[in-house]
Design a protein with these regions (language model features):
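Surface-exposed beta-strand edges and their flanking turn/coil or helix-capping segments
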Residues: 94-96, 125-131
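Low-complexity, Gly/Ser/Thr/Pro-rich intrinsically disordered linker/tail segments
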Residues: 111-120, 128-168
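Short, small-residue-biased leader/transition segments that mark boundaries at the very start
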Residues: 1-5
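Catalytic nucleophile-His microenvironment captured as a short glycine-rich beta-strand/loop
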Residues: 92-114
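Long, positively charged binding patches that form subdomain-scale interaction surfaces
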Residues: 8-95
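Short, flexible loop/turn elements at secondary-structure junctions
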Residues: 84-87, 104, 117
Length: 168
């Protein structure tokens, strides 16, 4: 699926994404001709629902992206996002993407996942036999919460909650 960001009102997010935006200022070609407003529309936090249910939060994130003009269409690859829920205070309750990668078909025998795990590291290509295997890999790395009153990390495939083999 391909991502499209339509014209939209102010998307903000600069205060959350300042390190990314500084990097993009130094290397504007990394946006492939897109604007930092498009980057912020996708990666700026979205106001979270008052819930710890990942399906409720996934729908909240989808609606937040839609309000910013972020949509996905069918194509050969998918964006996989690890989404975190933070409740900093009574007035700060947000969802944000903590990690992202691209999922590609590997013919009849699995899936390729491309990710950048750290600025100083090269991109990594890993082959998985299934979405369930990819989910296990990502959750082992990022599901590190201990009894918080927030939603545990969850995965989105484009704008759909990824539940093992369910998202496609």
């Amino acid at each position: 699926r391909q991502m499209c960001i339509r014209d939209r009102p102010d998307t903000n997010g600069e205060d959350w994404l300042f390190m990314d935006l500084e990097t993009l200022k130094r290397d504007p070609d990394a946006l492939c001709g897109k604007s930092t407003a498009d980057f912020c529309a996708l990666f700026a936090p979205v106001e979270a629902a008052d819930s710890t249910d990942s399906s409720v939060q996934a729908e909240t994130l989808r609606k937040g992206w839609a309000a910013r003009g972020v949509t996905f269409s069918d194509g050969g690859c998918s964006m996989i996002s690890v989404v975190f829920h933070d409740r900093f205070s009574e007035t700060e309750n947000t969802l944000f993407i903590g990690h992202v990668g691209v999922l590609l078909p590997a013919g009849d025998d699995g899936l390729y996942f491309v990710e950048k795990v750290a600025f100083q590291e090269p991109y990594r290509l890993t082959k998985f036999e299934s979405r369930a295997a990819l989910k296990s890999y990502l959750m082992a790395k990022y599901d590190t919460g201990w009894g918080q009153d927030t939603t545990p990390p969850f995965l989105m495939e484009n704008d759909v909650l990824m539940d093992g083999e369910a998202a496609q």
